[in-house]
Amino acid sequence: MPHCFTFKPASPEGSLGDDHLPHPSPEGSVASTFNLSHELAHAFQTPSYHDIRSRLLVIDPTQENLELFLSQELRPNNESVQEALSLRHAKQTTLTNLVSTYFQHSEDATRFCLNLYQNVHSARCHLYTPLLDLFNIFPRDSHSAIDESFCNLAFDVFLKLDTFENPFASPESHSFQDTQLCFYQLADKLDTRIRKSKSRVRLLHHATAGSALCLVTAVVVVAASAAFIAYHALPTILVVAGPLCTPYLPHSFKKKELSNIFQLNVAAKGTFALNKDLDTIDRLVSRLHTGVKNDKLLIRLGLERGRDVYTIPEFVKQLRKSHVNHTHQLEVLVDHICRWFTNVNKSRSLLLKEILRPQT
């Protein structure tokens, strides 16, 4: 395998800031075999952009190694997620289904991004590094006569590179569309569930206010009746008035719905932010697909012209011009993959924290 050139790190700009998330509810304590303090501390020990990048760039991006990298670097891991959900939600509900779906989609999308890194590595090692080696040898001055040996060398390199398949999927690829569609559908479901929960909270608020008014009215009626009704009749009035003035839904239901809204908001805003990241990555991959396609077209045209000392230098010249731009695009894509990892860890960790937050 040829030696591959490395990238210079770019400045990370996270797209998932704290302002995207709802204000947390008050902290409390919980008694459970599940260590809440330890889990929250571990969840927020998410690797930084530079940590992720430094670890990713040193591994051999085979499928097995990338899967191992995912299991080590994705926070929180599946075990923590399942324990948290089983602790807070004993029964399977719409909320738990949506939250579980968010965690699963974010993991699948992260695996997809790691596969893109594998494609970047393939393009670097099997296309752009051999071209760079050729550029370092081939004379830059196209006006002077080029030695036939250089043209033969370039032609042989073209023969080898012509067999290289474009590692980047076309913009019409189902894999990318399916990944994005999952997030779009999840966003719609979360939005619907949030509206439903908010509607329930408003209903509970009106019911509570109505029951308070009912209680005041009952007290007034009882006081007025006391002047005309014998003492032994008072318990009967209270027995009748009590059920009529009791809130239709207990206050704990309202707290539960508010807790649900907090969790749904974190999941919804995390979904929105990650979808934006996917859109950016999609555009980068699309440009790289076109760039590799055009480079391969130049290589094919060069081969069709044969070992000509006049045309081969022109094709090398054109490939040299596009080389800087395309290798820079590869670097930018790697930056966004590392940024994705940072953002998805932060988003998942914040949702886990909201799930484990005690209801007070």
From Swiss-Prot:
The chain crosses the membrane at residues 205-225, 229-249. It is found in: Membrane. GO terms for cellular component: membrane. It comes from the Eukaryota. It is a multi-pass membrane protein. Residues 1-29 are annotated as: Disordered. InterPro entries: DUF677. Keywords: Membrane, Transmembrane, Transmembrane helix. Its main location: membrane. Pfam families: DUF677 (PF05055). Belongs to the UPF0496 family. This is UPF0496 protein At3g19250. It comes from Arabidopsis thaliana (Mouse-ear cress). The lineage of its organism: Eukaryota, Viridiplantae, Streptophyta, Embryophyta, Tracheophyta.
